[in-house]
């Protein structure tokens, strides 16, 4: 069996409480999960059970105060900004609500080029990649010049997926 690509071991996420001597709020208490290459996993649970918090911990957006978050064998729980930026080539997120995750004032091309620009991809290569991404998610190439509001919810979800795939994670 192959080693996990993502391995969360006893992850704890705590947030400080306001007030003198109040114990921190434990948003996650010892959560473990491993995902192997090529595996698809869905997290299911009650509202407030920590699904989003675990995702945020993996992405470095929630403070991991215990346990480990290993990506390809490296503990990424306490990576700084430069390390996170380099890691963004390998880890991307597709948000649950695609409309609020897409900037309404940018064209689809601008939205898809943004992660490529951050990684210093040449403009000509980025434009070519946009066409590939649209094709990959089943949208016509003329979608690049349109705004998010011009698409259905399902099409916006495909645009969000295309953005996540832009860097070939």
Please tell me what each predicted stretch does.
Residues 19-23, 63, 76-92, 110, ...:
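ABC ATPase NBD coupling module
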Residues 44-46:
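The feature captures the beta-strand-to-loop junction immediately N-terminal to the Walker
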Residues 59:
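Helix-to-loop junction immediately C-terminal to a conserved catalytic motif
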Residues 75, 124-142:
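Conserved ABC ATPase "signature" region
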Residues 147-151, 155:
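Conserved ABC ATPase signature
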Residues 161:
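Hydrophobic anchor residue at the start of the ABC signature
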């Amino acid at each position: 069996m192959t080693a996990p690509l993502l391995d969360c071991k006893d992850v704890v996420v705590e947030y400080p409480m306001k007030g003198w001597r109040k114990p921190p709020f434990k948003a996650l208490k010892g959560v473990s999960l491993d995902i192997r290459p090529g595996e698809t996993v869905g997290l299911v649970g009650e509202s407030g059970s920590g699904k989003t918090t675990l995702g945020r911990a993996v992405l470095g957006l929630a403070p991991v105060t215990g346990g480990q978050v290993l990506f390809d064998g490296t503990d990424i729980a306490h990576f700084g900004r430069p390390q996170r930026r380099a890691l963004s080539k390998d880890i991307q997120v597709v948000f649950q609500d695609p409309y609020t995750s897409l900037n309404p004032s940018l064209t689809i091309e601008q939205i898809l080029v943004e992660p490529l620009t951050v990684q210093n991809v040449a403009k000509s290569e980025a434009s070519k990649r946009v066409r590939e991404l649209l094709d990959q998610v089943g949208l016509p190439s003329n979608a690049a010049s349109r705004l998010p509001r011009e698409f259905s919810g399902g099409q916006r979800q495909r645009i969000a997926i295309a953005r996540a795939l832009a860097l070939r994670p």
